Curated annotation (Swiss-Prot):
Pfam families: Catalase, Catalase-rel, Catalase_C
SMART domains xref list: Catalase
Function: Decomposes hydrogen peroxide into water and oxygen; serves to protect cells from the toxic effects of hydrogen peroxide. Involved in sporulation.
Top EC class, one word: oxidoreductase
UniProt GO molecular function: catalase activity; heme binding; metal ion binding
Protein's name according to its UniProt entry: Catalase-2
Record-linked InterPro entries: Catalase, Catalase_AS, Catalase_clade2, Catalase_clade2_helical, Catalase_core, Catalase_haem_BS, Catalase_immune_responsive, Catalase_large_C
Cross-referenced PROSITE patterns: CATALASE_1 (PS00437), CATALASE_2 (PS00438), CATALASE_3 (PS51402)
Residue stretches of biased makeup (Basic and acidic residues): 1-27
Gene Ontology CC terms, in alphabetical order: cytosol
The keyword Magnesium is assigned to this record: no
UniProt-annotated stretches for the region Disordered: 1-43
Length: 686
């Protein structure tokens, strides 16, 4: 193996490489891009104080020209994104399954860069729209960059990449008026769904709570496609990739998501940024599902169909490692905007399958980067550079940074001893899996891809009653925005193939006739792994609004705040005004927000500490009432209990914890923390 391949990476390898490109203007004199010091930056060069600007003003020309060209084309999809750095560690050697080097040594921390994104909206759209979320990970391995380019939903709308432009044209704003932004609640999207029923399964996921995640830190990630693991002996297995968030999978409610879009359009990116800035870690475990080659046709679904998942009860997920995200980016444009992911960026031991959507993506990603990043050398942009050296005969082109020495730029050659020379498998060279392929040229999908509804039914049947009601409400909202009654009827008809009761509820909600009920299958299949009801629940990293005013109880508040801090809960003190408030015993407390600057939708729970000042405050009442209606935990003590009663008409119920004149507020604190950890109290009667 060459010296290049012997170089070990660690969690800091990428950061150390990026350090070569960082610059800090603090304490520096201003210069032009050519290094010439600038003496004036507020006035252009003119002929007299009121005269015309002179063309010889090179500083003005350079400054304005650069400004005019600052923006690059935004991504056609996944335009709004946010990135973060971290590292990945495998738990145990995966030698039995793959030769991928980064999956062998548990002591190695492979640096990663992750970009989370929405799909449909433009770069300036809101974070909390109903949509799939992108979850793309770039591993900077010793063998080159490996990109796992996935979503937070394990399936996709279409089966063949040739339909991708049609899908995107359908869900993007309608071209005649460029509306609506970052939303699928319009005619063209649902017309596409009605006439392309392969999308039914993915639509069920996007209409579910998965379409409005609470946080990037609390959503799963999936590779979507079927790939291959190949080991040293050449044995291959089909594989699907999963990211499992350590905090569990949690979502917003739709009313809350819409309000957050107005109150804080940056809600998800702010949540991620602040968590890491405050010293927190964002963690996901990497899992794989594997199927032996000889079992390819063992199942009642085609394992290469991207509109199908592999039920975890049939093909268990093997957890193989953990990713820790722990460093924010230094510059969003240089990193998040310029990063270029590609499902074709693989390393030895990971290979492709004949998934027709994956095959098309292998072309499309390179093609789109060429125009977005200005040419074929985007791999030299710092965030995209591998941490291992690269050597080939790809020369020149726009923005070339590498200075290639010598006269040889071709293969084979004798002038340079045939260097750079191909590497054998033993030397780390990538060898494609030798799959036998035969068939006649044909534009047709396999009959095994024609089952559009079985897994959509599986998803529906696996939902809890609350999750089902959320799906129904989402359909009624989205399809209710459609102007064409004909399209509405078609949508109802399509989803009558999934569940008759679901179709009937949608029909009722949008005012069309329900189709005749189809004969229901006697066998009702479920997959418990698909429901969020069974997810991990913890109070760690949750965000609590503490409502307090002058006259608050010092002992009570100190006890509760310390308990929340011990659980890793973030607290904001909210009051009528910014500045300090005073307890009954004279202790001061500073407010970090007011009822004008923040809102209950930005928090996971509310603790009404009270104080005489807030007892009859209508803004405080509205704050609590909204949290109550969104099924959040509410704690109240002393005067806060009166505030709670005035807000929602009760001081009892699911997720409500109260205490008055307690000698010790430890028990109250614990009960409130448990209520926060539950995420939402869905059985609360609103």
């Amino acid at each position: 193996m060459s010296d290049d391949q012997n170089k070990r990476v660690n969690e800091h390898s990428k950061d150390e490489q990026l350090e070569q490109y960082r610059t800090d203007n603090s304490g520096k004199k201003m210069t032009t891009n050519q290094g010439l010091r600038v003496s004036e930056d507020e006035h252009s060069l003119k002929a007299g104080v009121r005269g015309p600007t002179l063309m010889e003003d090179f500083h003005f020309r350079e400054k304005m020209t650069h400004f005019d060209h600052e923006r690059i084309p935004e991504r056609v999809v996944h335009a709004r994104g946010f990135g973060v750095h971290g590292f990945f560690q495998v738990y145990e050697p995966m030698t039995e399954y793959t030769r991928a080097k980064f999956l062998q040594d548990p002591s190695v921390k492979t640096p990663v860069f992750v970009r989370f994104s929405t799909v449909a909206g433009s770069k300036g759209s809101a974070d909390t729209v109903r949509d799939a979320r992108g979850f793309a990970t770039k591993f900077y391995t010793e063998e080159g960059n490996y990109d796992l380019v996935g979503n937070n939903i394990p399936v996709f709308f279409i089966q063949d990449a040739i339909k991708f432009p049609d899908l995107v044209h359908a869900f993007k704003p309608e071209p005649h008026n460029e509306m609506p932004q970052a939303a699928t609640a319009h005619d063209t999207f649902w017309d596409f769904v009605a006439n392309n029923p392969e999308s039914a399964h993915m639509v069920m996921w996007t209409m579910s709570d998965r379409g409005i995640p609470r946080s990037y830190r609390m959503m799963e990630g999936f590779g979507v496609h079927t790939f291959r693991f190949v080991n040293e002996q050449g044995k291959a297995r089909f594989v699907k990739f999963h990211w499992k968030p350590v905090l569990g999978v949690h979502s917003l409610v739709w009313d809350e998501a819409q309000k957050i879009a107005g109150k804080d359009p940056d809600f998800h990116r702010r949540d991620l940024w602040e968590t890491i800035e405050n010293g927190g870690k964002v963690e996901y475990e990497l899992g794989v599902q594997m199927i032996d080659e000889e079992d390819e046709f063992k199942f009642d679904f085609d394992i290469l169909d991207p509109t199908k998942l592999w039920p975890e009860e049939l093909v268990p997920v093997k957890i193989i490692g953990k990713m820790t995200l722990n460093r924010n980016q230094d510059n969003v444009f240089a990193e998040t905007e310029q990063v270029a992911f590609h499902p074709g960026n693989v390393v030895p031991g990971i290979d492709f399958t004949n998934d027709p959507l994956l095959q098309g993506r292998l072309f499309s990603y390179t093609d789109t980067q060429l125009i977005r990043l200005g040419g074929p050398n985007f791999h030299e942009i710092p965030i995209n550079r591998p941490v291992c050296p690269f050597h080939n005969n790809q020369y020149d082109g726009y923005h070339r940074m590498t200075i290639n020495k010598g006269p040889v730029a071709y293969h084979k050659n004798s002038l340079q001893n045939n260097d750079p020379s191909p590497a054998t498998a033993e030397e780390g060279g990538y060898v494609h899996y030798q799959e036998k392929v035969e068939g006649k040229k044909i534009r047709q999908r396999s009959d095994s891809f024609n089952d559009y509804y079985s897994q959509a039914k599986l998803f529906w049947n696996s939902m809890s009653p609350v999750e089902k009601q959320h799906i129904i409400s989402a359909f009624c909202f989205e399809v209710g925005k459609v102007k064409s009654k004909d399209v509405q009827r078609q949508v109802v008809d399509v989803f009558s193939n999934v569940d008759a009761d679901l179709a009937e509820e949608i029909a009722k909600g949008v005012g069309v006739a329900a189709p005749a009920k189809r004969k229901a299958s006697k066998e009702i299949l479920t997959s418990p792994a698909l429901s969020q009801a069974r997810t991990v629940k913890t109070a760690s990293t949750r965000k609590v609004a503490v409502l307090a005013g002058n006259g608050f109880h010092e002992k009570e508040l100190q006890t509760v705040l310390e308990a929340l801090k011990q659980e890793g809960i973030t607290v904001d003190i909210i009051s009528q005004n910014l500045g300090y408030m005073t307890s009954g015993s004279g202790q001061q407390l500073e407010a970090s927000g007011t009822f004008l600057t923040v809102d209950s939708v930005l928090y996971d729970a509310v603790y009404a500490a009270g104080g005489l000042e807030l007892k009859d405050n209508k803004q405080a009442m509205a704050f609590i009432r909204e949290a109550y209606n969104h099924y959040k935990a509410i704690g109240a003590a002393n005067e806060g209990i009166d505030l709670l009663q005035s807000s929602v008409g009760t001081t009892e119920g699911l997720g409500i914890v109260t205490a008055k004149d307690e000698p010790d507020y430890t028990a109250f604190s614990k009960a409130f923390i448990d209520a926060v950890a539950a995420h939402r109290h869905w059985d609360r009667r609103i």
